[in-house]
Amino acid sequence: MKVLSLIFVIFSVLVLFASAKDPVCDQPKAVGRCFAAFPKFYFNSSSGQCEAFIYGGCGGNENNFSTLEECNAKCA
């Protein structure tokens, strides 16, 4: 019985950590202060999806990915 309880606890912890989202994903979209026009992706926590935006080239935050795949791997 103790072994079964231990297995349940370990499984629960693994599920909890596997489903934990990176805090970067909760940051808002930030286009930056400059005036370049780089196509990027960010995770929209309201829609629960990665979305395209135009990045100005400087400033901003870490919720800024070069590809949709990179954004999905980190946040979705």
UniProtKB/Swiss-Prot annotation:
Tissue: Expressed in salivary glands.
Keyword tags: Blood coagulation cascade inhibiting toxin, Disulfide bond, Hemostasis impairing toxin, Protease inhibitor, Secreted, Serine protease inhibitor, Signal, Toxin
Disulfide bond annotation, renumbered to this chain: C25-C75, C34-C58, C50-C71
Record localization: Secreted
Cellular component GO terms held in the UniProt record: extracellular space
Coiled coil: none
Matching Pfam families: Kunitz_BPTI
InterPro entries: Kunitz_BPTI (IPR002223), Kunitz_BPTI_sf (IPR036880), Prtase_inh_Kunz-CS (IPR020901), TFPI/VKTCI-like (IPR050098)
SUPFAM superfamilies in the record: BPTI-like
Origin: domain of life: Eukaryota
Function: Potent anticoagulant protein that inhibits the hydrolytic activities of all serine proteases tested (trypsin, thrombin, elastase, and chymotrypsin), with the highest efficacy on thrombin.
Name listed for the protein in its UniProt record: Tabkunin 2
Source organism of the structure: Tabanus yao
